[in-house]
Amino acid sequence: MVQRWLYSTNAKDIAVLYFMLAIFSGMAGTAMSLIIRLELAAPGSQYLHGNSQLFNVLVVGHAVLMIFFLVMPALIGGFGNYLLPLMIGATDTAFPRINNIAFWVLPMGLVCLVTSTLVESGAGTGWTVYPPLSSIQAHSGPSVDLAIFALHLTSISSLLGAINFIVTTLNMRTNGMTMHKLPLFVWSIFITAFLLLLSLPVLSAGITMLLLDRNFNTSFFEVSGGGDPILYEHLFWFFGHPEVYILIIPGFGIISHVVSTYSKKPVFGEISMVYAMASIGLLGFLVWSHHMYIVGLDADTRAYFTSATMIIAIPTGIKIFSWLATIHGGSIRLATPMLYAIAFLFLFTMGGLTGVALANASLDVAFHDTYYVVGHFHYVLSMGAIFSLFAGYYYWSPQILGLNYNEKLAQIQFWLIFIGANVIFFPMHFLGINGMPRRIPDYPDAFAGWNYVASIGSFIATLSLFLFIYILYDQLVNGLNNKVNNKSVIYNKAPDFVESNTIFNLNTVKSSSIEFLLTSPPAVHSFNTPAVQS
């Protein structure tokens, strides 16, 4: 048993390990966000006894856990490892042992992150770790160093995984499966892997320079030695902006599959969906300075970054309208994954619209570092990446586990997180427009109302997380008895196999999602005999 999980080279087992780590980290990250919202529920010091450093440590912990230990391990490590080989008809990934080490450096990174919060007074730098706040003068002691090591380890994990996915997709497709026939989820992981490959080395360079500045007396970002902290911001955001697309593009792939299945229609404009994802990925590297309009960039530089940022809205719009066109005229069934997908469309678009306001260099002078920004990126991440994660879970888990979840509870869980997330993040836009700054544990009484509302929302969202854990428990224990469409499931297939994309795709030139044609759960080694793509 120990050997199976510790030394595993099987993509399916490694995917399960990623999911377990993601669930654990997600619960820890949610706990931190709940403490943050409790502290902000009313003006003055509530629970942290005026300890602003601790507040910022919680902000760092929440951000890094949610980004590097929940969304990336679940969407890329979990769904990517499990489904990508199945969808292309491969027996496993190209480098199974690299796959193993890519997972096992993540728990080490988690240990470093947790340790960084427990030594000295923690790393209270924000997840961006900007110098001079993160310099040795402002943060003496090993906290920031440990946080940097945590980022290094997650970077190594993601880089190894990315190399594995790229080689697997290029070299291990089954007979007849050309790149144009790849399912959209495989394309999304493939494009994401390239983004990781190009952006993570830049982050690693930046935080390594910071490590040297802190411990070995270099002056990369030290003004007194001729360095420039703005250089760090450029390096960080050259990674940081592609990173947000790394978080959302696998979600795009999942939503495409879900929308197609529950509308009983092929995705509208499949090839243009691929080109849209690729364009978003490419443009993501050309807009990083929109995060730093207020550091003193030239007017013409600001003009360029404003227009380049707005251009990203075009391929994103193509994707949104293609999904709507897929739904239009379809035979729609509002099962739980479809509810998440439709909510994703509305709320991701909403997050994109607030982003258009932030793209303007002149407007951003007012919005920068206010709760408007927090509201914007949580709409995109909390209701984009997380909703797509839930959609993917409810869509594929019956096929992966061979066990059904309780549909009624799953829909209740959807409505709880839908209401909770909106109640948290919608009021933040009002707070930001009125000038409430981020990362500050106290605020004037004028901001009390909407903060109280947001804190109530965080309780609703946390309740939905507890319900999800129960749904997962119920699925594992009673999965064979749970009914689909009020009928006991007697066939050995996922409940929505009957309306899966395989039906209308098998006889066409488009790729069929072959993961639903396998047994449920799939065998330990699928495709010992290569499948042939028609």
Swiss-Prot record:
TM regions (residue ranges): 15-39, 55-88, 98-118, 143-171, 184-215, 229-263, 270-295, 299-327, 336-358, 371-400, 407-431, 450-474
Binding site for Ca(2+): E39, A42, G44, P441
Membrane topology: Multi-pass membrane protein
Key words of the record: Copper, Electron transport, Heme, Iron, Membrane, Metal-binding, Mitochondrion, Mitochondrion inner membrane, Respiratory chain, Translocase, Transmembrane, Transmembrane helix, Transport
InterPro entries assigned to the protein according to its UniProt record, in alphabetical order: Cyt_c_oxase-like_su1_dom, Cyt_c_oxase-like_su1_sf, Cyt_C_Oxase_1, Cyt_c_Oxase_su1_BS, Cyt_c_oxase_su1_dom
Cofactor(s), names only, from the UniProt record: heme; Cu cation
GO biological process: aerobic respiration; cellular respiration; mitochondrial electron transport, cytochrome c to oxygen; respiratory electron transport chain
Binding of Fe(II)-heme a, residues: H62, H378
Mitochondrial matrix topological domain: 1-14, 89-97, 172-183, 264-269, 328-335, 401-406, 475-534
Ligand binding (Mg(2+)): H368, D369
Keyword presence, Iron: yes
Enzyme class: translocase
PTM annotation, UniProt: The N-terminus is blocked.
Pathway: Energy metabolism; oxidative phosphorylation
Binding residues annotated for Cu cation, in chain numbering: H241, H290, H291
Mitochondrial intermembrane-side positions: 40-54, 119-142, 216-228, 296-298, 359-370, 432-449
Residues binding heme a3, per UniProt: H376
Function field: Component of the cytochrome c oxidase, the last enzyme in the mitochondrial electron transport chain which drives oxidative phosphorylation. The respiratory chain contains 3 multisubunit complexes succinate dehydrogenase (complex II, CII), ubiquinol-cytochrome c oxidoreductase (cytochrome b-c1 complex, complex III, CIII) and cytochrome c oxidase (complex IV, CIV), that cooperate to transfer electrons derived from NADH and succinate to molecular oxygen, creating an electrochemical gradient over the inner membrane that drives transmembrane transport and the ATP synthase.
Name of this chain's protein: Cytochrome c oxidase subunit 1
Gene designation per UniProt: COX1
